[in-house]
Amino acid sequence: MGVSRSTLRTEEIEEIREVSIFSQREIKRLYKRFKRLDKEEKGSINVEDFNQIPELSMNPMLPRIISIFDVNRDGQVNFKQFVKSLSTFHPKADKADKIKILFKVYDINNDGFITRDEIETILTMMVGSNLTKEQISSIVEETLNEADVNGKGKLDYPDFYNSIGSSGCNAENMLSISFNPFE
């Protein structure tokens, strides 16, 4: 699906339905929206194109999120990757899938652990200058103290998953984006 076409073939729609939460109708409408974003008609979009989506443009984590779904690591996301990424953030998407993505957002170097520096980097991206470095460091320290049950000084996926589940945070809402694929 590298080159942009005006319509999707039925087998392409079915293939995408298998890896997403969207209906056939929603996929067709998402394709129209994708084509509007793909102004150069190259069959893929980049970070700047994603910024044209109002529901995503204000998210300071957007470049990090896109990098997770950019499986080719070329700065481009094709339609299937686009739908799969939006599916993950659908309000009805599986909580465990959302937490896996959130873990990947924090695990910047993709080593399977979230370090103190990675938590600090992500937190800084989220709050900008609204908190001082000292406040951010305090939050990072508290997070590690509560979530790092084995005292490794970093979080593995089970630590992270358990801390999200026990923190009372609602991962379903936190990782949901309400958007209208019918625009």
Swiss-Prot record:
GO cellular component, one term: calcineurin complex
GO biological process per UniProt: calcineurin-mediated signaling
Keyword Protein biosynthesis attached: no
Binding positions for Ca(2+) per the UniProt entry: D107, N109, D111, E118
Residue runs in coiled coils: none
One GO MF term attached to the UniProt entry: calcium-dependent protein serine/threonine phosphatase regulator activity
InterPro entries: EF-hand-dom_pair (IPR011992), EF_Hand_1_Ca_BS (IPR018247), EF_hand_dom (IPR002048)
Lipidation (N-myristoyl glycine): G2
Family per similarity comment: Belongs to the calcineurin regulatory subunit family.
Purpose: Regulatory subunit of calcineurin, a calcium-dependent, calmodulin stimulated protein phosphatase. Confers calcium sensitivity.
The name this protein goes by in its record: Calcineurin subunit B type 2
